Each structure stands twice: as C-alpha cells, then as structure tokens.
C-alpha cells in the first residue's frame, strides 16, 4: 500500500476459518512473490544496501533513515518482502532428501512409471488408503522389493506394462543419494555401476511422474508436487526477519541468515562461472552450494558438518533452530505468553477466604500497579493514594500526566504533586480488585481463573481449599 492511500473498510462477508492447508512452495510461486532476484554478493556500498544484494531496499529495511522501495513504508510500517536466488544447479532440500529417496524407489528410472501395477495383489488395497503420508509409506514398503519395472509381483516372470528394466539400489549418505545399478554381463560399461545421483537428475525423474501416479503416492498436484521437494529457486527472507545489529559507529554485525545467504551467493556465482570447466571443479563448487543451502535450513543434522562463522567459529543458527523447541518462534513467541504486572510465589490454604477470593501478600500488592483514570468521582481517593506514595499501602507509584509525561513518585514530593481529571494513576493493588490466577501446567481453561484480591500479611498466596481442584494444586510447595 502506497503512503497517503485512504483505508476503506472491506465490503466482503465475514467467513469462518475452518482449516489451514500447508503445502510446498512452487518455484513459480517463489518467483511471483519475489520482488528482486538476488545475485550481488556485496551487501552494502558506502553504507547503502546494494541493488540486487541480500539487503536490497526492495525487500524492506530496518534502517530508520531509509524506506522500502516496494511499498514506501519505513521500518515500522513495512513487514518486508521476499526475494529469490536462481540456483545455477538444483540442490537437495535437507528436510526432504529421505522423502526423495523413497519416491525414487517407487518409480522406474527409465520410464518414470510406478513400479507397482494394477496387476499386483496389493494394488487395490493401496488405492483405498486415504492418509497421504501413510499411503506413501505403504507404497514404498511394496515397491522397495520390486527389482524390475513392469513385473506383476516378485514371483512373476511375466511383464505387464513397464520398461522391463532392472532398478538400482539406493541409499542416502549425508547430502547425497548413491545408486548401485545392476551389472549386465553382456555390457562391459555396466561394471562401473555405482555413482551419486545429482539433484538435477532426480528433479527430471520426479518431474516426469504422471499426475495419476503422484496421486497414488499421496501427493496433491496443486499443493505439493514431487519435483518441488528439490530446490531450484531459493527464497530469500526479507531483512526485517534477519535484522543487523550496529556494534559501533561503523561496525555492523549481520544476522546468521544474512551471512549464510551471502555464502550461498558466492558458491552459486562460482558454480555458474565454472559450469564449462572440468567435472571435478564443477563438483567441488556444487558440493559447497549444497552444503550452504542445507545448513541455511538445518545446521544441527546428525552426521552433517556444522556451518560456522569464519571469525570466532560460532555455529550458524539456521531456520529450523529458530522455529523448533521451547525457545523457538512457535512455542516461545506465538504460543508462549509473557506478561508484565505479574507475580509468582508459593500457595498456602486459608479456609476463611471466600471461594472467589485470593490472598495476596502486601509486598506484592505494593509492587503490582493498576492504572486508574482520575475522574470527578474518584479524585479525592486518588489524591490520598498519591500522598501515601509508593512505600505505604495503599498508595501509588506513578502518575501519567499531560502528553503522556510520567512522574515517578519515588522521587517526587507526594504532598505537593498536582493531579487533574484525565490523569492516570498507577496505584497499588487493593482489596476487591480482580486478577487472573494461574497454576502451571495450564492443561485446561480452569487453570486460569479470576479472583477478588484480599491483601494479607506474610509472603504466600492464600487460596480456599475448595478451589484447589481445577488448579490441581496442593500445599507442598507447588
């Protein structure tokens, strides 16, 4: 949206979201959502992001003095836009290489048809399987034992449709798929029967699988085609996802992802430059590109060499590490909740409290504040709280005055402090305020409930015994 455009409310009917469908990124989709093809290895030129570089201004910016060249938004308004890198040769996706191997075991290397035919005794049962993931695994279990394309079953010596060609044995080692082809005694050229399958070769085979065979394997032709499991066009995340940190006046520390994208660009440009040279030089540059693309996605794969910074040797934090686990984006940021104005202590029982009451220690009540707007009805009470100040309960800690100016009552003379209608007083917690009380693990909605505050001496939360059941609480220190 360009600056100055007047926002108008949509006239579309409200719809209920029933489900979210995930799929694989189509190279055409990556091209469509990209605003720039990234090919310049240099990130900055005299402090300004280079055109076609990893921090090209068309992808957005985190610099306060600059604006996004695509939407004209500043660092607060622009969420960023994706770019892309055209790879000189396709590479394996580290998360899908096992899946690629499974699919290759299910199709013929020559005609690219399924190794299992409708004459097979398990064909009908496999066709009835609905779960896509389960379906691929079941088809793989049957096809991995089929050695010749077109045989009706393992014991049959008669061929149905198919090429009749013997199939290679496949195994994954690191970021490679190794193929061992059967030796033909009449053909001496088959003696050297072991070789690595390139991602380009696998891409051609997967791309030639028919729509019907893809569906039989459990793939969706709109959301996830088999050939999309191999990377031929790499999306580049926008700079707001990987902001740089200024260490001094002229020193800029780039994010790990930016560093990795730069390494990918260097390896990709070197590979493109040497495509017409000797095979061993091409292979060396290709393996480097494969390594950097893999460690951009996952740098913690077992048995895989770790990508590190050249200075300091610190391991790169890859995309997977940012998403997974308790500290990741999903559990740590999206699902995890962090709040201000909260307190934590041990609970003890108090049968004298009402069911909806919560005994709160005075020390906590003096620390947690509630903002209350000054009105004609409460101005006298607010003045008393301000006079009591932050160290006498019930009192107040801050005043938010005209223009949002904050006054800390720890340093002000409370008796001389002026308040007026519309001011906001950050007052202490007092009796009959409503608060939310939570005990982990929060397994159901009754793990967080509302209570009326009753300020009490000592240092523990007090709770009526009859309220402990929904919290699954006891009084042994939990």
From Swiss-Prot:
Post-translational modification (record): Phosphorylation activates POL II.
CC annotations in GO: mitochondrion; plastid; RNA polymerase II, core complex
Binding site for Zn(2+) 2: 108, 111, 149
Binding site for Mg(2+) 1: 474, 476
Record's keyword terms, sorted: DNA-binding, DNA-directed RNA polymerase, Magnesium, Metal-binding, Nucleotidyltransferase, Nucleus, Repeat, Transcription, Transferase, Zinc
Pfam families (UniProt xref): RNA_pol_Rpb1_1, RNA_pol_Rpb1_2
Binding site for Zn(2+) 1: 68, 71, 78, 81
GO molecular function, one term: metal ion binding
Main location: nucleus
Catalysed reactions, as listed in the record: RNA(n) + a ribonucleoside 5'-triphosphate = RNA(n+1) + diphosphate
Locations listed in the record: Nucleus
Positions of Mg(2+) 2 binding: 474, 476
Example of a GO biological process term: DNA-templated transcription
Function in brief: DNA-dependent RNA polymerase catalyzes the transcription of DNA into RNA using the four ribonucleoside triphosphates as substrates. Largest and catalytic component of RNA polymerase II which synthesizes mRNA precursors and many functional non-coding RNAs. Forms the polymerase active center together with the second largest subunit. Pol II is the central component of the basal RNA polymerase II transcription machinery. It is composed of mobile elements that move relative to each other.
Record text on subunit structure and interactions: Component of the RNA polymerase II (Pol II) complex consisting of 12 subunits.
Family label: Belongs to the RNA polymerase beta' chain family.
Additional information: The binding of ribonucleoside triphosphate to the RNA polymerase II transcribing complex probably involves a two-step mechanism. The initial binding seems to occur at the entry (E) site and involves a magnesium ion temporarily coordinated by three conserved aspartate residues of the two largest RNA Pol II subunits. The ribonucleoside triphosphate is transferred by a rotation to the nucleotide addition (A) site for pairing with the template DNA. The catalytic A site involves three conserved aspartate residues of the RNA Pol II largest subunit which permanently coordinate a second magnesium ion.
Protein name as annotated: DNA-directed RNA polymerase II subunit RPB1
Organism of this sequence: Euplotoides octocarinatus
Gene: RPB1
């Amino acid at each position: 949206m360009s600056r100055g455009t007047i926002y108008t409310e949509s006239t579309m009917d409200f719809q209920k979201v029933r489900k979210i469908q995930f799929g694989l990124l189509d190279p055409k989709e990556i091209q469509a959502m990209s605003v720039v093809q990234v090919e310049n290895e240099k990130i900055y030129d005299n402090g300004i992001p280079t055109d076609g570089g990893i921090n090209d201004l068309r992808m957005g910016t985190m610099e306060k003095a600059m604006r996004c060249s695509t939407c004209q938004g500043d660092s607060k308004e622009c969420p960023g836009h994706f770019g892309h890198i055209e790879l000189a040769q396709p590479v394996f996706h580290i998360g899908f290489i096992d899946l690629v191997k499974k699919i290759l075991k299910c199709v013929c290397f020559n005609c690219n048809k399924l190794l299992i035919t409708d004459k097979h005794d398990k064909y009908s049962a496999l066709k009835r399987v609905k779960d896509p993931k389960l379906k691929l695994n079941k088809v793989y279990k049957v096809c991995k034992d089929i050695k010749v394309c077109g045989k009706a079953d393992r014991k049959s010596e008669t061929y149905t449709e198919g090429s009749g060609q013997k199939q290679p044995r496949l195994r994954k080692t690191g970021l490679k798929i190794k193929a061992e082809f059967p030796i033909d005694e009449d053909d001496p050229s088959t003696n050297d029967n072991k070789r690595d399958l390139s991602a380009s070769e696998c891409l051609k085979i997967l791309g030639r699988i028919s729509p019907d065979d893809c569906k039989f394997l459990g793939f969706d032709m709109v959301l996830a085609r088999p050939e999309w499991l191999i990377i031929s066009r790499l999306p580049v995340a926008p700079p707001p996802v990987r902001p740089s940190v200024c260490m001094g006046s002229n020193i800029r520390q780039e994010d790990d992802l930016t560093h990795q994208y730069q390494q990918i660009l260097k390896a990709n440009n070197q590979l493109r430059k040497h495509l017409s040279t000797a095979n061993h030089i091409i292979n060396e540059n290709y393996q480097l590109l494969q390594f950097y693309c893999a460690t951009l996605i996952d740098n913690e794969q077992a048995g895989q060499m770790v990508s590190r910074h050249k200075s300091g040797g610190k391991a790169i934090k890859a995309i997977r590490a940012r998403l997974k686990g308790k500290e990741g984006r999903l559990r740590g940021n999206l699902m995890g909740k962090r709040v201000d104005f909260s307190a934590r202590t041990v609970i003890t029982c108090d049968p004298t409290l009402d069911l909806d009451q919560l005994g709160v220690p005075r020390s906590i009540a003096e620390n947690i504040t509630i903002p209350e707007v000054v009105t004609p009805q409460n101005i006298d009470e607010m003045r008393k709280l301000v006079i009591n100040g932050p160290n006498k309960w019930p009192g107040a800690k801050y005043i938010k005055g005209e223009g949002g100016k904050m006054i800390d009552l720890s340093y002000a003379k409370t008796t001389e402090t002026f308040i007026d209608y519309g001011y906001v007083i950050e007052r202490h917690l007092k009796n009959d305020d409503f608060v939310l009380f939570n005990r982990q693990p929060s397994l159901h909605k009754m793990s967080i409930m509302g209570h009326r505050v009753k300020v009490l001496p000592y240092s523990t939360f007090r709770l009526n015994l009859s309220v402990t059941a929904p919290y699954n609480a006891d009084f042994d220190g939990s």
